[in-house]
Amino acid sequence: MGGAMEAGAVERITIVGAGLVGASIALALRRAQPGCRIVAVDPDPAVREALVPGIADEATDDLAAGLRDAQLVFVACPVGAMPAVLEAVARLAPADCLVTDCGSTKASVAVAAAEAFGVDSPRFVAGHPIAGSEGSGPAAARADLFDGRIWLLCPAGPAQEKAAARLAELLSRLGARVESIHPAAHDAMFAEFSHWPHAVAFALCAA
C-alpha cells in the first residue's frame, strides 16, 4: 500500500451498497472527517435519491465512476453478491486503494477476495461491523450506529495485518471498538452463536 491509508490522509471514500450499514458508515465518516468526499454506489435509484444531499456527496450506479480516485472502499452489499462485486472492485479501483467489506460471514469472503485481489493482498481486509437497527435502508442510517460497537477485522495473512492496523485507526474514529480475528475463527464463533436461540427455545419447550 502507498500513503493513501495513512492516519488522517483518507479524503476520498467510496461505499458500495448504501443500505443501513453503508449509509451509516457515510454518516459516521462525515462526523469523524467532515472534509472527506464520499461517493456511494448503489443500483437502486430510490436509494441513490435518498443519499444526496446529506449522506453522500455523490451517488451513482456506475461502479467504475464511483471508484475513480478512491483511497478507501467499503463494500456493504449482500454476502451473496460479494464475489462478483469484489472481482469488479479489484479490477476497477486504484492500485493503492484499500478495500474492506461489511459482510456477516468471512471465510467465503476471504476466498472470493483471494481470487479477486490475490492471496494475502494488502489491498483488502475483510471486516464485520457488529451493529444493526430495527430499520433498514438509508432512511434508518445513524452516525452513531457504530459507537461502542465491535468491528471485527479478519486479516488473512501478514500483509493484510499491516493494512488492518491502518484501517483500525480510521474505524476507531468512527466510534467502533476494533478487534482482529481469523476469518475461519470468525465464522466458527458466529455459527456457535446462531445455535443459542434454538437451544433456549428447546429448553423452554422441554421445561
Stretches with model-predicted labels:
Residues P45-V47, A81, K106-V109:
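Conserved short alpha-helix immediately C-terminal to the canonical SAM/SAH-binding motif I
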Residues L63-A93, C97-T100:
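Rossmann-like NAD(P)-binding element
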Residues G2-D62, R68:
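NAD(P)+-binding Rossmann beta1-loop-alpha1 motif at the extreme N-terminus of oxidoreductases
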Residues V85-A139:
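Rossmann-like NAD(P)(H) cofactor-binding subdomain of soluble oxidoreductases
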Residues R12, R37, R123, I150, ...:
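Residues at the starts of beta-strands that form the adenosine-phosphate
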Residues M5, A64, R91, A116, ...:
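Short secondary-structure boundary/capping segments
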Residues L145-A207:
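Internal alpha-helical scaffold of NAD(P)-dependent oxidoreductase catalytic cores
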